[in-house]
């Protein structure tokens, strides 16, 4: 797969899964890699340095992906060969302990932002380009204290399906990747982090937990011409974990 030296955008692209995606797309030929991030300037600079070493030009955009200003700044660095919405946030609480502001914050960044990115970036994207959203198993399975994030990921997958149909006449593919349990800093927000990792390690049929590079490989596939007829789908990358009752 080659991105023909085009620019790509990865939100939440400076750490964990996002950084792995950015580096993978750079290895596939992306000339400029725009990285969105909310905080941790040191991690952003480290990711930028790794991209330079890989031969790509990094562009760092700091801010909340749910912000119209940030989305407009992302669009200004296009046109893109691929837009990957990996950024995610949320409040990890039981349903009855959540507040309306938690809902607005989580849904805005995780789901609405993909629609905002499509409105801002898709008009300038060429046929053969891709939009990819990164989801999680919580979109279809009930995870402890995950009501807000799980609902937002279900919404993201729905947005993916609608965009896939509406953008098909432009030749733009839209899909999602749903990652299993991945040991990144994002898991630090879960009070049952160690239990989740232990369960994933012992119950995953593939014999190991998912790594960021596994997710990046799936995203790269969806951004490639090989995925020409894959539209509006959510590709599950979990080593078979979700197949078990």
Task: Go through each PLM region and give its residues.
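A conserved structural motif in NAD(P)-dependent oxidoreductases
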Residues: 204-215
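Short C-terminal tail/terminal secondary-structure segment
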Residues: 141, 220, 231-245
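Short, small/polar-rich loop/turn modules that mediate ligand/substrate recognition or access, typified
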Residues: 168, 173, 230-232
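Active-site helix of classical SDR
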Residues: 118, 152
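Conserved glycine-rich Rossmann-like NAD(P)H-binding loop of the short-chain dehydrogenase/reductase
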Residues: 30-46
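Conserved glycine-rich cofactor-binding loop
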Residues: 14-15
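Substrate-binding pocket helix/loop in short-chain dehydrogenase/reductase
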Residues: 94-95, 99-107, 196, 200
């Amino acid at each position: 797969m080659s991105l023909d030296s085009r620019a790509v955008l990865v939100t939440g692209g400076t750490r964990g899964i996002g950084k792995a995606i950015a580096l993978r797309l750079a290895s596939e030929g992306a000339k400029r890699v725009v990285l969105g991030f909310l905080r941790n300037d040191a991690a952003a600079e480290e990711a930028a340095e790794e991209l330079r070493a890989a031969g790509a030009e990094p562009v760092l955009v700091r801010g909340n992906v749910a912000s119209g200003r940030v989305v407009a700044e992302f669009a200004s660095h296009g046109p893109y060969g691929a837009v990957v919405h990996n950024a995610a946030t949320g409040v990890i609480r039981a349903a009855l302990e959540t507040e309306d502001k938690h809902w607005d914050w989580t849904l805005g960044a995780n789901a609405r932002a993909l629609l905002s990115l499509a409105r801002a970036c898709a008009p300038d994207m060429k046929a053969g380009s891709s939009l990819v959203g990164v989801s999680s198993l919580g979109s279809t399975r009930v995870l402890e204290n995950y009501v807000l994030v799980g609902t937002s990921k279900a919404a993201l997958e729905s947005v993916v399906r609608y965009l896939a149909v509406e953008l098909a006449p432009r030749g733009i593919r839209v899909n999602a990747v749903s990652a299993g349990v991945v040991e990144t800093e994002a898991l630090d927000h879960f009070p049952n982090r160690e239990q989740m990792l232990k369960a994933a390690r012992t119950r995953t049929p593939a014999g190991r937990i998912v790594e960021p590079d596994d997710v990046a490989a799936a995203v790269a596939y969806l951004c490639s011409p090989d995925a020409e007829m894959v539209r509006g789908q959510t590709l599950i990358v979990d080593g078979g974990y979700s197949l078990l009752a």
